[in-house]
Amino acid sequence: MEREKEQFRKLFIGGLSFETTEESLRNFYEQWGQLTDCVVMRDPASKRSRGFGFVTFSCMNEVDAAMSARPHTIDGRVVEPKRAVAREESAKPGAHVTVKKLFVGGIKEDTEEHHLREYFEEYGKIESTEIITDKQSGKKRGFGFVTFNDHDPVDKIVLQKYHTINGHNAEVRKALSKQEMQDVQNTRNNRGGNFGFGDSRGGGNFGSGPGGNFRGGSDGYGGGRGYGDGYNGYGGGQGGTYLDEKQNLYSSGNFGGGPSYGAGGGRGGYGGGPSYGNQGGGYGGGYDNYGGGNYGGGGNYNDFGNYNQQSSSYGPMKSGGNFGGNRSMGGPYGGGNYGPGNGSGASGGGGYGGRNRY
């Protein structure tokens, strides 16, 4: 039997005691299954624990079992496990933010809220579902939201990028509020350099390559050209905001296009291509008022795969940058030495998310 891809079997463990070793980490998580890998990340010079690590199980069911048994206490300390983000996804702003709300794109006219609930309830307890409609025409705008009572269902769902709902392909993303997107941008601004992934040709861009700036303004986080490395026009377009049913403000920009939908033309909409096209190739109007910014190309910031202990930054990266910074990424995995390093453009002192120090 072929083993599931590693990205579905790996957990990031934040908040580790500096006394926790790979042996104690392994002993704790082996109660839910067989581990194929276990590592505590350490400073390459001092060999001191950096306060986080990874465990990889033999199958995803074991990961589910472990996450269902939270909270986890190791060596007298409550740790914060989270499904690891794959390399190709970790380069995108907001990939590490912890949210309970899921964005669902590709919703067709014949798809109702009960279809969303029926499909996603197998992942966790759902608090609400919403399909966005045009206030004037009443027609569906092609996207919606599902809110869970926990972040783990969202993390699990986005690992599998495409889903089939009511017979139609749908794309899922974490739904980031405008404040969460602002936190992401503030992290970049306060870090003072390249975001720590890509090949830095864009000069401090979230996405590498010319014109791939993640820039904000009064109209949200749109603008600029998306870096077309497999995600032509992902982001870009004009900015704006969106209020959901609870009057929560969500940030802007067209949702962008992915390779399975064609080459996102015109306004950088979700898709492009004649079969989806309107407004210059944007899918359903390009998902105006949601998305946000240029998510850029693939990048090389890696919190998932290769544990390069010789690198001072969190995983190997071609830019030499660093994912840390003085501001929070909005997630629960904070401070200490999650992100600091000697990479170019890195200010250090920051964290993978959340609190400044444990």
Curated annotation (Swiss-Prot):
Q: Which UniProt keywords apply?
A: Nucleus, Repeat, Ribonucleoprotein, RNA-binding
Query: Which GO terms fall under molecular function for this chain's record?
Result: mRNA 3'-UTR binding; single-stranded telomeric DNA binding
Indicate the segments annotated as coiled coil, or none if absent. Answer: none
Tell me which SMART domains the record gives: RRM
Q: Record the organism.
A: Xenopus laevis
Biased composition (Gly residues) is annotated at 193-217
Where does the source fall among the domains of life? Eukaryota
The molecule here is called Heterogeneous nuclear ribonucleoprotein A2 homolog 2
Q: Name one Pfam family in it.
A: HnRNPA1_LC
Keyword Nucleus applies? yes
